[in-house]
């Protein structure tokens, strides 16, 4: 990731081993998400101008235990196909609960800033629980929800977006139209030859 993010244009990269809170972990030894708040704010305060901060959380990762490991779970689960499945879902749901608390903490802190902020949150995959298409409401195993929070009063919109369209969509909504790829997504996303032309643009940038 250190090399990848540098090649993507990021000025700095802070990995887990450089965080003083790396020992604040859940029972699966994943660092708890709330530790990210400090580092996100530090990154935003590191410059006087606007910042583009990309943060990766890990608390909700598996494998999920098939026996009880939480002393006082906020959420209890029953009704799964087995007791082991109950414990797995119970563990996962309680991690989600803690992650929700982190999001509240983060948005509370961001709302105090005297600058425009847009926060985009999404999961890059469903939990590793052996899910099938019959287990999910939309019948798609490779789609996840995204949420956009802001302190600018942007109008709420519901759009079905590919991951590679998200950044261009957000930038479009805040009036930023810089970069050939962003401008292409913003202007051509709903046109007939969008995917073919996008492939040609990518080829030209990489090899042209």
Language-model features: locations:
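Solvent-exposed soluble domains appended to multi-pass membrane proteins
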Residues: 1-208
């Amino acid at each position: 990731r250190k090399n990848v993010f540098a090649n993507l244009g990021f000025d700095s990269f802070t990995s887990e081993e450089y965080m003083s809170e790396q020992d604040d972990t859940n029972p699966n030894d994943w660092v708890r998400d709330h530790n990210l708040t400090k580092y996100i704010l530090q990154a935003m305060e590191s410059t006087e101008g606007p910042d583009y901060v990309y943060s990766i959380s890990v608390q909700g990762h598996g494998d999920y235990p098939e026996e009880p490991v939480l002393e006082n779970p906020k959420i209890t689960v029953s009704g799964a196909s087995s007791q082991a499945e109950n414990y797995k879902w119970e563990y996962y749901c309680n991690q989600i609960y803690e992650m929700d608390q982190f999001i509240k903490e983060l948005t509370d802190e961001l709302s105090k800033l005297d600058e425009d902020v847009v926060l985009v949150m999404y999961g890059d995959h469903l939990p590793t629980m052996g899910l099938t298409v019959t287990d999910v409401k939309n019948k798609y195993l490779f789609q996840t929800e995204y949420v956009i929070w802001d302190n600018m009063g942007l109008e709420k919109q519901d759009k079905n977006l590919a991951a590679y369209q998200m950044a261009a969509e957000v930038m479009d909504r805040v009036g930023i139209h810089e970069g050939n790829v962003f401008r292409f997504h913003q202007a051509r996303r709903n046109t007939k030859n969008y995917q073919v032309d996008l492939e040609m643009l990518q080829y030209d940038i990489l090899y042209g």
